[in-house]
Amino acid sequence: MHWLRLIFGLILVFALFRWTADVLGSNRGEFGVIIGLLVVGTTIAAKIFLFNRSFKESFSDVGLTRPNALGVLIAVVICVLMLVSIFVFASVTDSSFSFYPSWYLLVPGLFFQAGIAEETLFRGYLFGFIRQKYSFWKAAGISAVPFILVHLIMFYSLPFAIAFASILLSVVLSFPLARLFELGGNTIWAPAILHFVVQGTVKVLVASGESAQTFPLFWITVCAVIPLLVFLLPEKKIISPG
């Protein structure tokens, strides 16, 4: 019965998430703050009404409490390494990059929409629930399935090669995002930072030059490989919230 409630809540919140983003046309986080707050609010409401949890319990359940510094630090280091790779790409391919017009106005919305909203739903609500019953790898694997399915929509908006690579990325990325969730003390902030950089970078940077068209696939590869460094940290270092 709990599984049916879990799936119902997931579908309900995600449907609202997608519908709101489509109606508002928030492809680059233009209305991301509003969408993020809406998703967080409805996810908490789902925990309250579907699982009979209090507001305080639900707030904690979906990972919105104060994070452990370790997880956030690791997420930041991984993101810095990923961003440095862009300079390497530019140097090797003789490409150049510019910022999307008014990019700085998009950053907060991208963080709320790609980072906070998605991680509250998929890591806080979904993975957090499943992790109570299964080992890390099994819980991460199960929770990866819906995360992958919702990204299939990319086949309608992206070239096949990039969409296919993006689906593979969602498979791989599910695991380091889940690990960062635990490293951060079962909170969404560390994976939200990584998720924000993964999605936000290609929405605020514009590549130009002969090799510009290869940058999306390069970035997908970087986002699939570098976050796996999180698994080099001994498992005993993972701190549960106190």
Where are these regions (language model features)?
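Alpha-helical transmembrane segments in multi-pass membrane proteins
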Residues: 2-52, 105-106, 216-223
